Structure formats: structure tokens, C-alpha cells
Curated annotation (Swiss-Prot):
The modification Phosphoserine is found at S90. The gene is CPN60A1. Expressed in leaves, stems, siliques and flowers. This is Chaperonin 60 subunit alpha 1, chloroplastic. It is found in: Plastid, Chloroplast.
Length: 586
């Protein structure tokens, strides 16, 4: 039967041509020959392309790069201007370089390819440092502009790129030597204020938040329903699981279960039989200590007995489900165990709940449990063990490539090391709210970058001072085109400071020349129109932001300089509009 079905199916699939060819065979014994197969050919047709070579391709790229960089450059410095973006809904007024870059699409496909390269610079800098996107865009534009002029004049683009890369590497080493570590709250406030567009209120707010949660803490930014911007600090470790039963509530008005100096039992096992935890319940009752049970689940007889005895006043207990899932659940339970000084009773290690002793319980100074969350405030039993755990998580954070894993690891580090600060941003209008949130996000990122790698003079002064080191770096190059690459970087380093001065209404070249012949700490303060010690004036930038801007600009510029052709989709001609019906006025 199966073969008959197979035959009938195959017969249906035969083409008409096969039927004709096999006609004679069918008459002789009704046999069908499948030796000849129809080969179905298919082809993939690409869109029509437009191709440009040499000078024409370079000119198109440069035009697109200039348009985007000019628009982004308007925002640079304390006296930079805003840009209005007409997007969905009401227009946005923004001062953030990467937001502007991402919003720009040029109608000419070849020019848009150039603009896309600057978008890449801005995005990469934003991802790696969180700020400095405008500086990176301006640096990239200048390196590309001078580099393309040299290529047109006959320089070898590969040698130029090699010279640029070597020079940038030497500058980064010099930058790391010159960077100064962050010294206290004033430096943090100054970095945050500068990054937020010289907004001292935002700078003070970021400094206050970091004072409370520490350098390993997490700053989260949310919209507020009021006009005011406030900082709220969530002290201790918070997990996103609440009490299993509302009968555990101790504060009926707020629907919270609140304990002080509670013992903590931590396990990944499911507790269903009350006999498994009777020894622990008896011990904690004798100690007159409340008990917090964090387990995979507490159900059946165990839950019913706990609830009944809680209502009768015999037990002071609350049960909470373990947070997370799978391997992440185990890791989070281990974090809680280290924080409270408990022993993690893991099933795979044969540490059963029924064999638990009072010494395996942790202690939480304060526990607050709602229906959705649990907050634990504890003094770590072993500071060394806690620091080792934080160091391990930092190592994992450094090695991971996953954005999701990075967020979760940073969250766990914050919970172990101090807490989470939430900045609730308020404003009078939606447009102002969006701009304010972007500024605070930049300030937050710049602050953590400064804590990580130190600070340098702001206002583009650090780049101008670094340009004076290039002649010494250039002397080590034997190839003439590589030395030309070093000269290109030297010219480009002057552009951010010149543009900041220009946006402040001052002649850029004059400012750059004065900075160049001053000490490392000195530069031009565009806000006050004075030349002064920028560290003392609070005009400082994170060294990491400067480094990432320079590296990413050089990387993309090198790719452009070694480009010889552009291939883009040819725009399709628009269909003519339909003629209006006769007698109808349009």
C-alpha cells in the first residue's frame, strides 16, 4: 500500500514533458521511468547598481561626511547650539551628537555612504565610552579630509593608514601617562557638569548618587511624573520576588512583611513537607529570631503549616521564591548567601534542607518584602569573600560580549557593592524631558569613564597638547607617506578645540595657538572666555572618552582612505503622477 501511494505521489509530481517521454513505457507494462529528471533553473537578480571610482567616489564620500559632521559639530562645547529633529510625533530639540548622527539620512546614496561612516564612528564611541561622539565625528572628518587630499596628490593610502595607526597608538600611550585619577566628589561633579552641557545641577545630582552607591553602583534614569528631577537610592540588595502568601504580611497598612535581624535560609530546593524544616523552625523560635526562607518554591503542607502558625503568632516567618531562572538563579542565590553570610544549600551538592543547621543560616539586618520584591540590608559576614565575589563578577563583565549579560552582571555587582540610584527626570514639556534625559545619560557615562581611566584637561585642550608630541613619534617612521599620516593626525587634533572656540564666537586658530604653547593643565574655557588651569576651573574630560574618540576616528578614517570605489543602489525613477479626471480642478 505504501509503495502504491509513493508511486501515485511521484506520478503527480512528474512534469508533462516526463509524461510524454515515458508514454511508451507506460503502454508496456504501465511502468514509469524516473531516470530523466527536469532540472529547474533559477536566478537571483540584484538591484541595478551605480558605481563610482577614484576621485569621483572620494568626492561623494567627503560631501556626505561634511554634511553630517557640520550638523553634529554645531553642538560641540558649552556654547554649542541645539538641533531640531523632525521625527514621529512632535519635533525633538537635542544637543547629543550620536542622536543627531543616527537621525540623518541623505537623499544621495553615495553621499549617504559617507554619512554612514561618521554614524559608525559616533555609535562605536557611544558604545565604548558613552560620550565624546561629537569629538569623534569631528576628528574622523578632519583625518579623512586631509588624508584624501594627500591620496589625490599621489600618496600611498596603505602607508598613510599605517602612519595614522602608529601615531594614534603612540598618542594613546602618552594620554595614559598624562591622565590624572579622579580625586573625590569635586572631580566627579565637574566631569558630569561638563558632559551635561555645563549644567551644575545635573553634575551635583550625579555626584550625590555616586556618593551613595559607590563607583560600582548602578545609576538608572527614568521619567518622572512631576516637573522636578530627583535622586532615589535603593539601599541594599533587591530581588524581584515577593512573599509567596499575603498571610505573611506584618504591616497591613502598607502590605509589607518587615523584619529586623532575621535569619535567612537559602536553597534551590522545593519545600513541600513541613518535617524538612521543623528543626530550623524550632531553633529560630528558641532564638526569638524571624526567619526568611528563599527557596525554589514552598507549597502544600509546608506552606499551609507556616501560614497557620504565623497567623497564630507561633512563628515569625516569611517565604519567598528564588529569583531568576536556571544558572542565573543559582548565581543570584550565591550572591545573597555571600551578602548575608549564609550557606547556599544546593541540591547538586547534596546539601539538603532537612539536614540544615542554625550555623548555615545567614543574618539580614533589615528585610522588607512586598508582593513583588524583597529588599535585604545585611552586613557581609566576610568582607574578603564579598570583595572576591565582586572581583569575579567584574572579570565576567569584562569578558562577556552579550549586552543582556552585561546589564545583569552590572546589576549584580551594584547590589553586592552598595545599591542602585534612580534619577527620576522631570521637565515641563516632553521635548525638554527627552533632551534632559539624553544629557543626564551622557553625564552618567562620562562619570563612570572618568572613574575607570582618569581625567584630562577638557575643551579639546588635551588633544592640542597631544599634537605637540607627534614630531617625536614621527621621527621613528622611515617611510615618507607614514610621516605624512602622522602630520594628518597632528592637524586633525587641533580641530575640536578650534570648533569649540568658533561656536563660542572666537577665532579658533588663535585659541589653538595659545593652548599649544601653554602647560598641560592649561587651556581655553569657552564658558568664561578665559585661558586658565582647566583642572582648577573644573573643565575636564574623561581620558577614556578622549581615547575612544581618537581610536574610532582613526579606524574609520583608515578604511575610507583605502577605499577606491563605491557601489550603491541606483535610485529608481519615480512613477509619473496620475492625471486628474477631465473637468476636475487640482
Amino acid at each position: 500500500m505504501a509503495s502504491a501511494n509513493a508511486l501515485s505521489s511521484a506520478s503527480v509530481l512528474c512534469s508533462s514533458r516526463q509524461s510524454k517521454l515515458g508514454g511508451g513505457n507506460q503502454q508496456q507494462g504501465q511502468r514509469v521511468s524516473y531516470n530523466k529528471r527536469t532540472i529547474r533553473r533559477f536566478s537571483v537578480r540584484a538591484n541595478v547598481k551605480e558605481i563610482a571610482f577614484d576621485q569621483h567616489s572620494r568626492a561623494a564620500l567627503q560631501a556626505g561626511i561634511d554634511k553630517l559632521a557640520d550638523c553634529v559639530g554645531l553642538t560641540l562645547g558649552p556654547r554649542g547650539r541645539n538641533v531640531v529633529l523632525d521625527e514621529f510625533g512632535s519635533p525633538k530639540v537635542v544637543n547629543d551628537g550620536v542622536t543627531i548622527a543616527r537621525a540623518i539620512e541623505l537623499p544621495n546614496a553615495m553621499e549617504n555612504a559617507g554619512a554612514a561612516l561618521i554614524r559608525e564612528v559616533a555609535s562605536k564611541t557611544n558604545d565604548s565610552a558613552g560620550d565624546g561622539t561629537t569629538t569623534a565625528s569631528i576628528l574622523a572628518r578632519e583625518i579623512i579630509k586631509h588624508g584624501l587630499l594627500s591620496v589625490t596628490s599621489g600618496a600611498n593610502p596603505v602607508s598613510l593608514k599605517r602612519g595614522i595607526d602608529k601615531t594614534v597608538q603612540g598618542l594613546i600611550e602618552e594620554l595614559q601617562k598624562k591622565a590624572r585619577p579622579v580625586k573625590g566628589r569635586d572631580d566627579i561633579r565637574a566631569v558630569a557638569s561638563i558632559s551635561a552641557g555645563n549644567d551644575d545641577l545635573i553634575g551635583s545630582m550625579i555626584a550625590d548618587a555616586i556618593d551613595k552607591v559607590g563607583p560600582d553602583g548602578v545609576l538608572s534614569i527614568e521619567s518622572s511624573s512631576s516637573f522636578e528631577t530627583t535622586v532615589e537610592v535603593e539601599e541594599g540588595m533587591e530581588i524581584d520576588r515577593g512573599y509567596i502568601s499575603p498571610q505573611f504580611v506584618t504591616n497591613p497598612e502598607k502590605l509589607l512583611a518587615e523584619f529586623e535581624n532575621a535569619r535567612v535560609l537559602i536553597t534551590d530546593q522545593k519545600i513541600t513537607a513541613i518535617k524538612d524544616i521543623i528543626p530550623i523552625l524550632e531553633k529560630t523560635t528558641q532564638l526569638r529570631a524571624p526567619l526568611l526562607i528563599i527557596a525554589e518554591d514552598v507549597t502544600g503542607e509546608a506552606l499551609a503549616t507556616l501560614v497557620v502558625n504565623k497567623l497564630r503568632g507561633v512563628l515569625n516567618v516569611v517565604a519567598v521564591k528564588a529569583p531568576g531562572f536556571g544558572e542565573r538563579r543559582k548565581a543570584m542565590l550565591q550572591d545573597i548567601a555571600i551578602l548575608t553570610g549564609a550557606e547556599y544549600l544546593a541540591m547538586d551538592m547534596s546539601l539538603l534542607v532537612e539536614n540544615a543547621t542554625i550555623d548555615q543560616l545567614g543574618i539580614a539586618r533589615k528585610v522588607t518584602i512586598s508582593k513583588d520584591s524583597t529588599t535585604l540590608i545585611a552586613d557581609a559576614a566576610s568582607k574578603d569573600e564579598l570583595q572576591a565575589r565582586i572581583a569575579q563578577l567584574k572579570k565576567e563583565l569584562f569578558e562577556t560580549d552579550s549586552v543582556y549579560d552585561s546589564e545583569k552582571l552590572a546589576e549584580r555587582i551594584a547590589k553586592l557593592s552598595g545599591g542602585v540610584a534612580v534619577i527620576k527626570v522631570g521637565a515641563a514639556t516632553e521635548t525638554e524631558l527627552e533632551d534632559r534625559k539624553l544629557r543626564i545619560e551622557d553625564a552618567k557615562n562620562a562619570t563612570f569613564a572618568a572613574i575607570e581611566e582618569g581625567i584630562v584637561p577638557g575643551g579639546g585642550a588635551a588633544l592640542v597638547h597631544l599634537s605637540t608630541v607627534i614630531p617625536a613619534i614621527k621621527e621613528t617612521f622611515e617611510d615618507a607617506d607614514e610621516r605624512l599620516g602622522a602630520d594628518i593626525v597632528q592637524k586633525a587634533l587641533l580641530s575640536p578645540a578650534a570648533l569649540i572656540a568658533q561656536n563660542a564666537g572666537v577665532e579658533g586658530e588663535v585659541v589653538v595657538e595659545k593652548i599649544m604653547f601653554s602647560d598641560w593643565e592649561n587651556g581655553y574655557n569657552a564658558m568664561t572666555d578665559t585661558y586658565e588651569n582647566l583642572f582648577e576651573a573644573g573643565v575636564i574630560d574623561p581620558a577614556k572618552v578622549t581615547r575612544c574618540a581618537l581610536q574610532n576616528a582613526a579606524s574609520v578614517a583608515g578604511m575610507v582612505l583605502t577605499t577606491q570605489a563605491i557601489v550603491v543602489d541606483k535610485p529608481k525613477p519615480k512613477a509619473p503622477a496620475a492625471a486628474a479626471p477631465e473637468g476636475l480642478m487640482v
